[in-house]
């Protein structure tokens, strides 16, 4: 028998983002900034998603063409080129994007040289972008 303890939820949103890791957070910000009413949900009490496994680092690329070559090799032609190209181009723009986002709270964004895992063409274009510090942020409070 169905329970009568259901919660009434009648709010409406243009976009519902499921998962509050880097990708979900950025998707929610972009949708909001374009004028959408956004709901961001996550199954965990604290945000971060799988992003916490990367110690807060985002894989970045100095050169989108070199990143494309590397990523195409590593995926063994299982992913369409336009998807691989979009990923490579996004990786080449993530550091300036994060610097812009960090302006709101004075977060310190730092690049760290860290080549890709395998010595294929383009591996040396990769590095990491990290958020080193967020002034007056106490993670223990969350």
Where are these regions (language model features)?
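A short, basic/flexible loop-to-alpha-helix module at the beginning of a structural domain
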Residues: 1-12
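N-terminal Rossmann-like FAD-binding beta1-loop-alpha1 element of flavoenzymes
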Residues: 13-40
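Fold-independent oxyanion-binding glycine-rich loops
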Residues: 20, 42-44, 55, 62-63
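Glycine-rich FAD pyrophosphate-binding loop
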Residues: 32-54
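Structural recognition of the beta-strand scaffold that forms the well-ordered cores
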Residues: 40-42, 52-53, 59, 95, ...
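Surface-exposed patches in mature extracellular/periplasmic domains of secreted proteins
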Residues: 43, 75-86, 103-114
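Glycine-rich active-site loop/strand segments that organize a redox cofactor
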Residues: 58-90
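Conserved redox-cofactor binding core of oxidoreductases
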Residues: 89-142
């Amino acid at each position: 028998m169905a329970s009568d303890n259901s919660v009434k939820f009648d709010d409406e949103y243009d976009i519902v983002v499921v998962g509050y890791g880097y990708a979900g957070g950025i998707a929610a910000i972009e949708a909001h900034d374009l004028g959408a009413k956004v709901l961001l949900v996550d199954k965990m009490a604290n945000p971060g998603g799988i992003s916490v496994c990367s110690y807060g680092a985002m894989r970045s690329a100095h050169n989108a063409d070199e990143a494309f070559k590397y990523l195409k090799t590593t995926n063994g032609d299982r992913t369409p080129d336009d998807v691989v190209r979009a990923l490579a181009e996004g990786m080449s723009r993530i550091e300036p994007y994060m610097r812009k986002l960090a302006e709101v709270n004075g977060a310190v964004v730092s690049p760290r040289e860290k080549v890709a895992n395998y010595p294929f063409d383009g591996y040396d274009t990769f590095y990491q972008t990290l958020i080193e510090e967020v002034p007056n942020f106490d993670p223990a409070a969350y």
